[in-house]
């Protein structure tokens, strides 16, 4: 009888051990499955957070799109409320009646010259909607934009509603290129000007690309035979370009 009891007792203990092992295995398996399920959730949250952070990292910090793309044509009288600082070459814009004479100031400006208090004084005298600063070939030799940056800062402080446009230097004819001034030099200046405009959050107008010929130079058909004066039709084309590229 004792032998049977011992056998029964041994069976009971062995079954209990098997049950314990099975339960332990089931518990471990459940933990493992829960752990696996947790991983995708964690990855999902990470991906969502990463997506938000990525948008923030690559978000364009400027509010301008440069070069300014083509837009609807400006309303009549648009040039009555703008101020333009430009090289002497651009005087034709007022000579042919597109821009009022009182709104166009011409001279051989460099970035340093433009910075003078004259521009701020002009703006202070009238509520202009926009300021256009044209760059000429004289700017090629002086590519320091620190003074221009100061001017833009001053204008933004005094006239927060004024839109600022930096207009690229235009190409020159093949027969006016020299060792110290080429169309490649002008393109280099314009590249720096575009970069400066983006960093300063101001508008940039690519007038150079609008006028340049297939050979990378100003076509003779757009300019007078002598000097750097442009044809009347070219000035009218430039005026229309400005009126159809409003930021």
Model-derived segments and spans:
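N-terminal, intrinsically disordered, polar/charged segments of Gram-positive cell-envelope systems
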Residues: 30-83
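Active-site segments of SGNH/GDSL-like serine hydrolases
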Residues: 136, 156-187
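Generic structural signal for well-ordered alpha-helices
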Residues: 148-153, 190
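Conserved SGNH/GDSL esterase-like catalytic core that processes O-acyl groups on lipids
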Residues: 69-150
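Hydrophobic membrane-insertion alpha-helices, especially the h-region
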Residues: 15-31
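Catalytic His-Asp segment of secreted/periplasmic serine-dependent ester chemistry enzymes
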Residues: 33-35, 172-173, 177-247
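N-terminal Lys/Arg-rich, disordered targeting/topogenic segments
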Residues: 1-12
